[in-house]
């Protein structure tokens, strides 16, 4: 299976499917999307059809209302998208990514503490 690279709209639908945690109908996905963005039912239907063709979701046609489920986990999609973003935006440099993320002082003290622990864990794994 290839690395998933969903569009922004496809990613919004995947977030809904991951949140619901079970196969969902177009109507269920549409209702959830309406909470944050005005989206037509037919648009959601068309996007899910395209996503099925792209192997981002699987369509279960055993019931009258087809149900859709993601074919990739949220961490797998995040990892794939991050690798592409890192390469395209920061020439593959994790240092430049972190430097940029921390440059505007948006990280809270708690987040900085957690980041420090992650760095220590990464260093420990490298020594082994």
Where are these regions (language model features)?
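Short beta-strand "wing" residues that participate in macromolecule-binding interfaces
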Residues: 59
């Amino acid at each position: 299976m290839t690395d998933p690279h969903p569009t922004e709209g496809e990613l919004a639908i995947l977030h809904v499917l991951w949140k619901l945690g079970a196969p969902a109908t177009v109507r269920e996905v549409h209702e959830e999307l309406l909470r944050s963005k005005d989206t037509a039912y037919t648009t959601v239907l068309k996007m899910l059809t395209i996503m099925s063709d792209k192997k981002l979701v699987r369509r279960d046609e055993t019931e009258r209302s087809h149900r859709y489920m993601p074919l990739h986990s949220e961490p797998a999609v995040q990892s794939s998208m991050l690798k592409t973003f890192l390469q395209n935006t920061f020439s593959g440099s994790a240092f430049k990514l972190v430097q940029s993320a921390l440059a505007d002082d948006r990280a809270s003290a708690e987040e900085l503490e957690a980041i420090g622990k992650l760095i220590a864990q990464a260093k420990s794994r490298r020594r082994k």
